[in-house]
Design a protein with these regions (language model features):
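Alpha-helical structural segments
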Residues: 15, 19-26, 44, 61-81, ...
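N-terminal hydrophobic signal/anchor transmembrane helix of membrane proteins
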Residues: 84-102, 187-209
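Amphipathic alpha-helical interaction segments
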Residues: 19, 40, 88-89, 151-158, ...
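Hydrophobic/aromatic-rich alpha-helical bundle segments in the mid-to-C-terminal region
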Residues: 128, 140-195
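Helix-turn-helix
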Residues: 19, 27, 31-61, 65
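Basic, helix-initiating cap at the start of DNA-binding domains
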Residues: 1-31, 39-40
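Helical hydrophobic small-molecule/effector-binding pocket
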Residues: 87-119, 166-168
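Hydrophobic alpha-helical connector segments
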Residues: 65, 79-103, 126, 152-156
Length: 209
């Protein structure tokens, strides 16, 4: 545990926020969101749980900020992937960011839930702004309108959500699937399952060559 004095200057507050986000992201890498405990994060940063609330009023906002940063990395990577739109490349681009995929799977029903109306609007506007270069590229590349591009991205997001949840069952369910060979078809690999899903999806959504 690192011991920090109270952050007073703006640069100290920024450093504290970065430390909280780094600790939370490291914890999420090997745990589910439910298992990411604020007490553990605060202890790792060297502050009390009460002090942590000075920076983030609820746990979900910590991980929503991590999601925003992951999205900022993913958006230009998707631009590269769509330059030669092969499903394998697109699926690999997504699976290279497991933190993004894990958070996407709980975005609507967990992370966005405590947002105020203003926060919700600001967040979605951020998503739209982040995807704007990709939208322009897909508009020019495939002659898709903005609503069509947004629909495509929403379908891809839905694929990530569904494939992640189905390929990451509860510990009890995972044990049951391993124990019974008759249930082998329910043992899903996220990367392979996502690629299969995108193959079926993109054939319907993207213009043929």
């Amino acid at each position: 545990m690192r011991l920090y004095r109270r952050a007073r200057r703006q640069d100290e507050k920024i450093d504290r926020i970065e430390a909280i986000l780094a600790s939370a992201k490291n914890l999420l890498a090997t745990n589910t969101l439910d298992e990411c405990n604020l007490t553990t994060i605060a202890s790792d940063v060297g502050i009390t749980k009460a002090a942590l609330y000075r920076y983030f009023r609820v746990k979900e906002l910590i991980f929503l900020e991590i999601y925003r940063r992951e999205l900022a990395i993913l958006a230009p990577a998707l631009q590269e992937a769509f330059k030669t739109p092969h499903v394998e490349v697109l699926a690999a681009t997504l699976t290279k960011q497991p933190i993004f995929c894990k958070l996407t799977a709980v975005l609507g029903d967990v992370l966005e839930k405590p947002l105020t109306e203003d926060e919700a609007a600001e967040f979605k506007l951020y998503v739209l702004q982040t995807f704007e270069p990709l939208c322009l590229q897909l508009n020019q590349q495939f002659d898709l309108s903005q609503p069509q591009v947004i629909a495509l991205l929403m379908h891809i997001t839905s694929a990530v959500v569904g494939c992640w949840k189905l390929s990451h069952p509860s510990p009890m369910m995972a044990a049951a699937l391993q124990q019974h060979e008759a249930l082998a078809d329910f043992r899903l690999d996220f990367a392979a399952f996502l690629q299969q899903h995108l193959t079926m999806l993109l054939g319907q959504m993207l213009p043929s060559n």
